[in-house]
Amino acid sequence: MDELINLLIMDQVTLYEHVKSIDNPNYIKSIVPNGGILFIPLDEERYPLLCTHLDTINDFNDRPAPSIVDILIDGDTLSLNPYSSCSCLGGDDRCGVYTALKLINSNVPYAFGFFLDEEIGGVGSDKIGISSVMPYENITAFIGLDRRGKDQVALYGYDSVNLINVFEQEGYKTVYGTFTDASNLAKYWDIACINLSVGYYNEHTTSE
């Protein structure tokens, strides 16, 4: 819980610097200015790319990130203090960033993307999507960690029945999404993408 709270109180610039400072010998780190950061697993020929974004609606609305006093803790649930000046708590997408960082720390042999400015149209994933650092030939799927709820697998028209079945067999429910970095990247090479629930609710509101 403390690690997630530490991510929630960072603005996009601070979080970008935090992720950029991470060094793990099991990954190649690539930094694309104004795009984001990729971690590519060493000695792996095929892997999914798990996608997260570093901004929140607070950045979009020019509001500050929450401070410690802005965050209410009730058991395993975090929410925004109703007296806060923030636009949202920021679980979208700090929950996804938290999950990705945990997986990197566990040396899971997937690729990970941390993208800038998703909330204003996927600016960061567009820049990385057309850059030379994106190893499209090795990527099996784009998997977003950027969906509300706890049991949704969102589709965007770049579908793989086999990939969807993996999550439906685990109890996930298929829904249709509108936009996320994973779908933004899928358009470049027509690679399958999905977006998975990461545990936030009421995104983009003070009730998050």
Residue positions per predicted region:
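Hydrophobic anchor at the start of a short beta-strand
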Residues: 25-30, 47-48, 110, 172, ...
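Active-site metal-coordination/substrate-binding segment of hydrolases
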Residues: 31, 42-109
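Acidic/histidine-rich catalytic neighborhood of metal-dependent amide-processing enzymes
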Residues: 85-167, 174-175, 182
